[in-house]
A protein has these predicted regions:
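Conserved active-site/ligand-binding neighborhood in enzyme cores
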Residues: 1-344
């Protein structure tokens, strides 16, 4: 098994979809459009881990002539052995792809890696002497010097002691328009749309993540790949990676480096936290899928899951409680395998 550092340099603007899309098809009142569509769609800053998995699966597939002819899969058995039976899902294997790490930003000129900084990086957090009862449990109160509930906290990416606001890495690309019927030229119902995509603020930046595979992917370095449902295009860079990749952990504090799947029971040991949640869905497909139209039965959306956002911080009263929380994060193996639930 080989470990790689993979970079994605955007060719143009990029758009990473989230929970909502534009209206699909001609019926704005069908079930899909009622649940998922909006006239205002804004890209996420980072690609979803499932999008990186899909990109890697297709990269390996399209470079294998034994099971792919450039247009479609020709041998589903060989394809399943190469990239797995299907995309993300419980208990799934992804063939030659063994694991993916969380996505971060790399400064390719200075070889700096920027990861999400903890939400409390602007504040001095300490445990006060007072305690309180919450659901019958006695908890130590925490205080954050400098925090005001009237001023929303800033989000940063950090590289060592250096930190920059997340928004400083990106520049908005706004597109506003009206949809017209392609045959008649008449304005369609609910035709107004606004799409916010992004570009990097400096050409030196690229998305990056680590990957472990059982197939040599170095020959694919420099190819053009598509990421996300909007097919944003990137030039992929692939190099051997010999670093450990394991971030050190604080004894009584856990910071999320990636979105994380956690249930309410997993929060029982947390004494104090500063978090946000974000929606997560993914498309279900297999090597037998012929149509990738979201309205087709062959391609369906998963149920919505609430994930804890990267940068979320959790404090604990004892090392045992902190270790129990880390074990909970590690227990979601399907999510861990593709870069979710990573922490320091």
């Amino acid at each position: 098994m080989s470990r790689y550092i993979i970079t994605l340099k955007p060719i143009d603007k990029f758009f990473f979809g989230g929970d909502m899309t534009f209206s699909v098809g001609n019926n704005p009142n069908d079930n899909y459009n009622r649940e998922y569509s909006s006239y205002l769609i804004e890209s996420a800053y980072f690609p979803q881990q499932t999008s990186l998995l899909g990109m890697m699966r297709f990269l390996i597939l399209r470079n294998n002539e034994e099971c792919f002819d450039g247009v479609k899969i020709t041998d589903t058995i060989k394809a399943a052995g190469l990239i797995g039976e299907g995309g993300f899902g419980e208990g799934r294997s992804y063939g030659k792809i063994k694991s993916l790490g969380h996505c971060f930003i790399k400064d390719c000129a200075d070889n700096k890696d920027y990861h999400f900084a903890p939400y409390d990086s602007d504040y001095a957090v300490s445990a006060a002497e007072d305690t309180c009862l919450v659901n019958g449990r006695e908890l130590t109160l925490h205080k954050m010097e400098g925090f005001s509930s009237k001023v929303w906290y800033k989000k940063y990416l950090e590289c060592g002691s250096e930190k920059k606001e997340v928004s400083s890495f990106f520049v908005e690309d706004r597109r506003i328009g009206i949809n017209r019927d392609i045959k008649t030229g008449k304005t369609e119902d609910a035709a107004l749309f606004k799409q916010v995509s992004y570009r990097f603020s400096d050409s030196r930046y690229a998305f990056a993540f680590h990957a472990e595979t059982d197939v040599d992917i170095l020959p694919y370095d420099g190819q053009v790949v598509s990421v996300g449902a909007d097919n944003s295009q990137f030039v992929i860079g692939i190099k051997n990676d010999h670093e450990d990749g394991n971030a050190g952990c604080s004894a009584l504090k856990v910071t999320l480096l990636s979105p994380a799947r956690l249930l309410s029971k997993d929060m029982d040991k947390v004494a104090f936290c500063m978090t946000e949640v974000m929606p997560f869905r993914y498309l279900r497909s297999t090597v037998h899928t012929k149509s990738y139209n979201v309205l087709d039965r062959e391609l369906s959306r998963s149920e919505r899951i609430e994930m804890y956002a990267p940068g979320s911080v959790f404090y604990f009263s004892s090392e045992a409680d902190a270790e129990a929380f880390r074990n909970a994060l590690n227990s979601y193996e399907d999510f861990r395998r593709i870069g979710f639930n990573e922490y320091k």
